[in-house]
Regions:
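Active-site segments that bind and position negatively charged phosphate/pyrophosphate groups
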Residues: 58-185
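C-terminal hydrophobic structural anchor segments
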Residues: 174-206
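A glycine/threonine-rich phosphate-anchoring loop and its flanking beta-alpha core
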Residues: 1-68, 160-163
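Generic detector of intrinsically disordered, low-complexity, polar/charged segments
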Residues: 2-3, 105, 132, 192
């Protein structure tokens, strides 16, 4: 609730278009974790994935010596992975877990981690098209697209993929290509662990 973006969908034309403006930043925002208590597990999972991909698209580009921004992003990614199991548990929601999840998701898109660094929102742009055409939940399109973008752009993103592998997942053994493969696999496994499929075939597509 602290960002400056939005999306407009027009079902008649199968269009889903994003927009943002500095004028859309709120003067203040109120974040109440208890408002998440009535969300079904599917939407909690969607929130985890969306926040993860928001962070990745401001992080997984190329090195620009933005040391603090890199560490901010890596910390958010690790926090989401840490919070996910408890967030997805059945039973009464845990206030501290939801508070940390809400704050982490907020920091993933309020402009902090993207300040002064290159960004790549290709995953979101492709995901928007899948939602507009096939009605797949937004976050679920991202879980399908991000691993494929990581694979397709692995040479252009090699340095940051290796950094991501080491700092987020602790992957330090093997060749560079093996470490990148392992990092992509861990990303897929994380999405799948919260019940979010990573293949179009899960939606009878492709």
């Amino acid at each position: 609730e602290m960002n400056n973006g939005g999306v407009v969908t027009r079902k008649a034309t199968h269009a889903k278009l994003a927009f943002s403006s500095p004028l859309c930043f709120p003067q203040f925002s109120v974040l109440d974790p208890t408002k998440t208590y009535t969300l079904p597990p599917r939407q909690i999972a969607n929130g985890l994935v969306d926040a993860f991909v928001h962070t990745m698209e401001q992080y997984l580009t190329y090195p620009v010596n933005a040391l603090a921004q890199d560490r901010f992003a890596e910390g958010l990614l690790q926090t989401l992975v840490e919070l996910a199991p408890r967030a997805m548990q059945e039973g009464a929601p845990d206030y501290d877990n939801r508070a940390n999840l809400m704050w982490t998701a907020t920091l993933a898109l309020n402009g902090l981690i993207g300040a002064g660094v290159p960004q790549d929102w290709a995953t979101h742009m492709i995901g928007h098209e899948l939602t507009a055409l096939y009605g797949i939940d937004h976050a679920r399109t991202l879980a399908i697209v991000l691993p494929q973008v990581m694979q397709a752009r692995r040479e252009a993103k090699r340095a940051k993929l290796l950094q991501y592998a080491e700092r987020v997942w602790g992957i330090t053994e093997g060749s560079e290509d093996a470490r990148i493969d392992a990092a992509i696999a861990r990303t897929v496994a994380f999405f799948e662990s919260v019940g979010v499929p990573t293949r179009l075939s899960a939606y009878q597509l492709g």
